[in-house]
Amino acid sequence: MSRVCQVTGKRPMSGNNRSHALNATKRRFLPNLHSHRFWVESEKRFVTLRVSVKGMRVIDKKGIDAVLAELRTRGEKY
């Protein structure tokens, strides 16, 4: 399963670790992903999404029905 937020589309990004001597070694910054069950009142069922914490805040703001409608238009499975 890829490390991508289903709501925001956040993906891992690359950067550098920096030692005290400022040596650079490549590393990945991973999104803060969680598999979370959301209750969808209109469908009377739970939906499991793999979302970042930012994605959870978006769901709190817009509502789960609006977010699921966006996912459907993108053709994403949930």
Swiss-Prot record:
<dbReference type="Pfam" id="PF00830">
    <property type="entry name" value="Ribosomal_L28"/>
</dbReference>
<dbReference type="InterPro" id="IPR001383">
    <property type="entry name" value="Ribosomal_bL28_bact-type"/>
</dbReference>
<feature type="region of interest" description="Disordered">
    <location>
        <begin position="1"/>
        <end position="21"/>
    </location>
</feature>
<dbReference type="InterPro" id="IPR037147">
    <property type="entry name" value="Ribosomal_bL28_sf"/>
</dbReference>
<dbReference type="InterPro" id="IPR034704">
    <property type="entry name" value="Ribosomal_bL28/bL31-like_sf"/>
</dbReference>
<dbReference type="GO" id="GO:0006412">
    <property type="term" value="P:translation"/>
</dbReference>
<protein>
    <recommendedName>
        <fullName>Large ribosomal subunit protein bL28</fullName>
    </recommendedName>
</protein>
<dbReference type="InterPro" id="IPR026569">
    <property type="entry name" value="Ribosomal_bL28"/>
</dbReference>
<keyword id="KW-0689">Ribosomal protein</keyword>
<keyword id="KW-0687">Ribonucleoprotein</keyword>
<dbReference type="GO" id="GO:0003735">
    <property type="term" value="F:structural constituent of ribosome"/>
</dbReference>
<comment type="similarity">
    <text>Belongs to the bacterial ribosomal protein bL28 family.</text>
</comment>
<dbReference type="GO" id="GO:0022625">
    <property type="term" value="C:cytosolic large ribosomal subunit"/>
</dbReference>
